[in-house]
From Swiss-Prot:
Species annotation: Halothermothrix orenii (strain H 168 / OCM 544 / DSM 9562)
UniProt entry keywords in alphabetical sequence: Cell cycle, Cell division, GTP-binding, Magnesium, Metal-binding, Nucleotide-binding, Septation
One record GO biological process: division septum assembly
GO cellular component: cytosol
Residues holding GTP: 30-37, 57-61, 75-78, 142-145, 175-177
Entry protein name: Probable GTP-binding protein EngB
Gene name of the encoded protein: engB
Organism classification: Bacteria, Bacillati, Bacillota, Clostridia, Halanaerobiales
Gene3D superfamilies linked to this entry: P-loop containing nucleotide triphosphate hydrolases (3.40.50.300)
Amino acid sequence: MKIKNPRFVISAYDFDDFPTHNWPEFAFSGRSNVGKSSLINTLVNRRKLARTSSRPGRTQSINFFNIDDRFYLVDLPGYGFANVPRKVKEEWGRLIEGYLNNRPNLAGIVQIVDARHKPTRDDLMMVDWIKASGIPCLIAATKVDKISRGSRKKQEELIKKTLVLEDFDGQFTFFSAKTGEGKKQVGKFILDLVDSFKG
């Protein structure tokens, strides 16, 4: 995927902040500190387009990125972070739910899980919602460079079994921001949907 001009557009803290346009959008969803921002940066070949942090819960808004005036990447706040006040969690939940349920040009979702661990209950709830919505989805298991080659098949089976993916026509790929593995697969998932999008 060749990208010439990726640019940050806005950090949306409320529905009124969402940008108005007719391009397809691709949401990146996952729990806190799973590597959403790093995946976006790798995808667009920019180290600091999406802000990354070792501190979970850093992304507190929905961040919109315009890619070559062709489509948008949307970085959703991470879920499942314990050390956040309940009221803040509820606001994040309201914002995320409002975006996912009411964004007519949402063309696809990249659901991110950690390749090293069994998906959480929150991951399963999110995937169940995606299944019910019918929105095209790619499951990206990040940080695959941190597990051995020999354990990959076992981890893939664990992820697919936990998320009940056998009855789901979504795609799956391992991903590493460090090595670039999976970048081509994520890019193809997005571009195929851009080409078929009718807003």
